[in-house]
Regions:
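Short N-terminal targeting/anchoring amphipathic segment
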Residues: 97-115, 119, 128-131
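Active-site proximal beta-strand in glycosyltransferases
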Residues: 5-6, 123-142
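A short beta-strand/loop micro-motif in the catalytic core of glycosyltransferases
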Residues: 109, 164-173, 191
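A short, charged, and often flexible helix/loop element on the N-terminal side
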Residues: 65-93
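Carbohydrate-associated surface elements
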Residues: 174, 196
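Membrane-proximal helix-turn-helix segments that form the acceptor-binding/catalytic region
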Residues: 150-168
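Conserved donor-binding/catalytic core segment of Leloir-type glycosyltransferases
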Residues: 208-227
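N-terminal subdomain of nucleotide-sugar transferases
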Residues: 1-59, 65
Length: 227
C-alpha cells in the first residue's frame, strides 16, 4: 500500500514568496517543509487555499509531490482568523482530493490551528494520526494582551488539536515551554525544529578593520577570509 504525507496548510501557499502581498514568514516554513519532503523523496500531497484565480488548482511538481489549491470561492488575501468559517467546505474538498488515491494510506501534517481542525477530523475519518506545526497559540497571545474576537473558540480548538496530535512541532524552546505550561502537553510529544540558516548569516558583515565582507553584488569576497 502506497503511503502519503498529506500537508494541510490553508493560510500559507509555499509557492508564493514571503513579502508578496500579505504573505509573511509562515511561507518560509511551508516552503522549507515542501523542499525537504521532495529532497528525501517522500510521497506527499500538499493542500493550500487558492488565493488568486490565475493560480493552478493542481500541479504535479515532482514524481513524489502533488500540489493542490482548494477553491473556497473567496479570492485574494483574507484574514487568517476567518479560515475556520470555511471548515466544512475545506473538509469536503480535501476528501474529494484524497478519493483519487486508491488503496493508499495517509498521515496528516497540519500547520496553524484552522488547518489543525481539519487534520483532527480527517485523521479520525481515515483511522490514522496527524502531526501539527503550532506557529502561534492563543493562550500565550491572550497572556500578552493581544485581543482576538475568536480567542475562546481558538483556545477550545487548540486544546483539542494539541492533545490529540501524535507530535507537535515547535519553533523555539519558549514555545515548548508554553505547550507544557499552558496546554499540559507531555514533553515526549514535542519536537523542536529549526530552519536552515543562510550562509550570509554565518559570518560577520564586517571584518576587524571595519571593511564590508560582502561586495556590492552580494558576493562574498573569496580571496579574503575573516574569522
Amino acid at each position: 500500500m502506497k503511503k502519503y504525507v498529506v500537508i494541510i496548510d490553508l493560510h500559507c501557499d509555499p509557492t508564493i514568496p514571503s513579502g508578496a502581498g500579505d504573505i509573511g514568514g509562515g511561507n518560509t516554513y511551508s516552503r522549507s517543509l515542501l523542499q525537504e519532503l521532495q529532497k528525501h523523496n517522500i510521497n506527499h500531497i500538499y493542500i493550500t487555499r487558492k488565493k488568486y484565480p490565475h493560480l493552478e488548482e493542481y500541479i504535479s511538481m515532482t514524481p513524489v509531490c502533488d500540489f493542490y489549491r482548494i477553491n473556497l470561492g473567496d479570492w485574494g488575501p483574507i484574514d487568517k482568523d476567518v479560515l475556520q468559517n470555511y471548515h466544512l467546505r475545506s473538509k469536503e474538498l480535501i476528501i474529494e482530493i484524497l478519493s483519487k488515491y486508491k488503496d493508499c494510506s495517509f498521515i496528516f501534517h497540519s500547520s496553524y490551528w484552522q488547518s489543525g481542525m481539519l487534520a483532527y477530523d480527517l485523521a479520525k475519518q481515515y483511522k490514522t494520526f496527524y502531526v501539527h506545526t503550532i506557529l502561534s497559540n492563543a493562550k500565550k497571545k491572550e497572556q500578552t494582551g493581544a485581543i482576538e474576537d475568536i480567542v475562546k473558540q481558538r483556545i477550545h480548538e487548540e486544546e483539542k488539536i494539541f492533545a490529540h496530535a501524535k507530535y507537535l512541532i515547535c519553533s523555539s524552546l519558549s514555545e515548548i515551554n508554553e505547550m507544557q505550561e499552558l496546554y499540559a502537553i507531555p514533553p515526549e510529544h514535542l519536537i523542536l525544529a529549526g530552519l536552515k540558516v543562510d550562509y550570509h548569516y554565518l559570518y560577520p558583515a564586517y571584518n576587524t578593520r571595519g571593511e564590508v565582507r560582502i561586495n556590492t553584488l552580494g558576493n562574498t569576497i573569496a580571496e579574503q577570509i575573516y574569522l
